[in-house]
Design a protein with these regions (language model features):
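Peripheral, non-AAA+ core regions of ATP-driven protein-machinery
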Residues: 1-223, 227-233, 481, 499-503, ...
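Basic, amphipathic alpha-helical bundle interface domains used for macromolecular binding and assembly
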Residues: 37-45, 60, 67-77, 295, ...
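Hydrophobic residues in beta-strands of the RecA-like P-loop NTPase core, especially within AAA+ ATPase
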Residues: 106, 157, 309-316
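Short hydrophobic alpha-helical runs that function as membrane-insertion/retention elements
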Residues: 134-139, 153-156, 222-225, 245, ...
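Conserved alpha-helical scaffold flanking the Walker A/P-loop in AAA+ ATPase domains
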Residues: 213, 269-275, 285-308, 341
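Walker A/P-loop
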Residues: 223-265, 330
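Conserved inter-motif catalytic segment of the P-loop NTP-binding fold
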Residues: 250-284, 291-292, 446-455, 479, ...
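Walker B catalytic acidic pair
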Residues: 305, 311-313, 323
Length: 523
């Protein structure tokens, strides 16, 4: 007898439909899997047998062939345990075939028949809704995640026996409440570094604070260079706090990314907190960008919609940093394999921090630099010119004077006035972004505008254009750097609540281009 059950496999950001076919044929007892299964699916033979036996069902005493269709696409993961077991029960006459009609199933089986959670449930739920499934069958631990997709009935159970009883007796679908859009996420990614609650670092480093506001408002990438202990890391950790809240579409996409990566945890709502990812400089290319035979998202994609912080930038291998160039430009990371090609979104605000030299004290009046000019040159040669070219904002942080250290201990209320003056506040950033959405096509940020769009919608005064041309000619800026200079000037004008870009905005934008092409300015 032949039985079928619908499921799905994860490929990149998408879940593709898979039909699990089970056929019982005369022959020696055994279970054979076909359809390009990976090792985890091959091992499901033993899990399914043990789960059926320990749940009180009869194991087949004939030859069992399980096909995962379409057969030309590789499948991976233990999520096929449940559909294989249900189809096997139908094929052996222990479950009515009509009970599985229109259902999409996914879940891992324990040897005792328990249903265990698996990754990618949110993506599979979206696919099930697209395929107009009657209901989505998942383990109880995944029910809340699956319910994030509205309009899709959810059936869940803790064990295989409980699930079969529900299907046999036609118990109504679980009433998992659809989360409200305003409800915050209950968990965050375990590898995300949460920003500290203190606003102390925003009471010092005025120049860097303005750069932080520009980066938050326009989505510009930021490089901070300074001696140890001047506040680079603490400033970077404040950036997610002044970014506007995630929109519904951004929250759904970020939650889906974390579900596919397996870092979502138990949630009852969409992830609303903007991510802050701070990978160590020993992270591999696969860890930073993503990878694998069936690609998974890396730190770059997991920071989508938030901040990717690269501390000790010059300690990262140059080859890995250069691989970031195209994804940072396009906001999408494409991965090609022999059998597939997929894309992961990676629209991030990159914040990088580094010391000015190997010893870290070059330019510090209180500490003598022990590095030679050759050592400093080699130190900065670890960063390629094209990579530096993509960092819109490049600023030098000076050591905090002793007389200003007490300001670090000010309360949030004490520092509110200074924050407002420097536009380092969520309200100022939100107001600037609102202007961008109203002016720019498709609500793009200034950092995403092309040259044609910037000329058409940027509202740049003629004298500002003349000033910009003089700067480009004098500094011999590349086409990319000159375009980014205009984008930053447009963002500065938005923060100043000025409709047109003037000469003063071009002049201020130039101050944030300290290390164009080469780091000679600090050597």
């Amino acid at each position: 007898m032949l039985a079928r059950c619908s499921s799905a496999s994860i490929q990149g950001m998408e879940a593709l439909p898979v039909t699990v076919e089970v056929d019982l044929a005369p022959g020696l007892p055994g279970l054979q899997l076909v359809g390009l299964p990976d090792a985890a699916i091959q091992e499901s033979r033993e899990r399914v047998r043990a789960a059926l036996r320990n749940s009180g069902f009869r194991g087949p005493l004939v030859r069992v062939i399980v096909n995962l269709a379409p057969a030309d696409r590789r499948k991976e993961g233990p999520a096929f345990d449940l559909p294989i077991a249900l189809a096997l029960l139908v094929a052996s006459g222990q479950l009515d075939p009509q009970k599985l009609e229109g259902l999409c199933c996914a879940g891992e089986l324990g040897l005792d028949g328990s249903l265990r959670p698996c990754r990618g449930i949110l993506a599979i739920a979206c696919q099930a809704k697209t395929q107009q499934a009657k209901a989505f069958v998942v383990p109880s631990a995944n029910a809340a995640e699956a319910s994030l997709v509205g309009g899709l009935p959810i059936v869940s159970a803790q064990t295989l026996g409980q699930l079969v009883e529900q299907l046999r007796h036609g118990i109504e679908h679980n009433s998992c409440p659809h989360p409200t859009r305003e409800e915050p996420a209950t968990t965050t990614s375990p590898s995300s570094a949460s920003a500290p609650s203190s606003a102390a670092p925003l009471t010092i480093q005025h120049f860097a604070r303005k750069a932080l506001a520009i980066a938050a408002a326009g989505g510009h990438h930021l490089l901070m260079v300074g001696p140890p202990g001047c506040g680079k890391t603490m400033l970077a950790r404040q950036l997610p706090k002044i970014l506007p809240p995630l929109s519904d579409s951004e929250a759904l996409e970020l939650t889906r990314l974390q579900s596919i990566a397996g870092t979502l945890g138990n949630v009852t709502s969409l992830v609303r907190q903007r991510p802050f990812r701070a990978p160590h400089h020993s992270t591999t290319a696969a860890g930073l960008l993503g990878g694998g035979t069936n690609p998974r998202p890396g730190e770059l994609s997991l920071a989508h919609g938030g901040v990717l912080f690269l501390d000790e930038l010059t300690e990262f291998p140059r080859s890995i940093l250069d691989q970031l160039r195209q994804p940072l430009e396009e906001g999408v990371l494409w991965m090609s394999r022999a059998r597939l090609r997929c894309a992961f979104p990676c629209r991030v605000t990159l914040v990088a921090a580094t010391n000015p030299c190997p010893c870290g004290w070059h330019g510090d009046p209180s500490n003598r630099c022990r590095c030679s000019e050759l050592q400093r040159q080699r130190y900065w040669n670890r960063l390629s010119g094209p990579f530096l070219d993509r960092l819109d904002l490049q600023c030098r942080l000076e050591p905090v004077p002793t007389g200003q250290l007490r300001r670090c201990f000010k309360t949030t209320a004490d520092s509110t006035e200074n924050q407002t003056e420097d536009s380092v506040s969520p309200e100022a950033v939100q107001a600037a972004r609102t202007k961008m959405c109203q002016r720019n096509p498709s609500g793009q940020l200034n950092s995403q505008l092309s040259a044609l769009e910037l000329g058409r919608y940027g509202q740049i005064e003629e004298r500002a254009f003349q000033c910009w041309e003089q700067v480009v000619s004098k500094r011999q800026l590349s086409m990319r750097s000159s375009l980014r200079l205009l984008r930053v000037a447009r963002t500065i004008a938005d923060l100043d609540a000025v409709p047109n870009v003037g000469e003063q905005h071009i002049a201020e934008a130039i101050c944030f281009r300290s290390y164009d092409q080469t780091p000679k300015a600090i050597i």
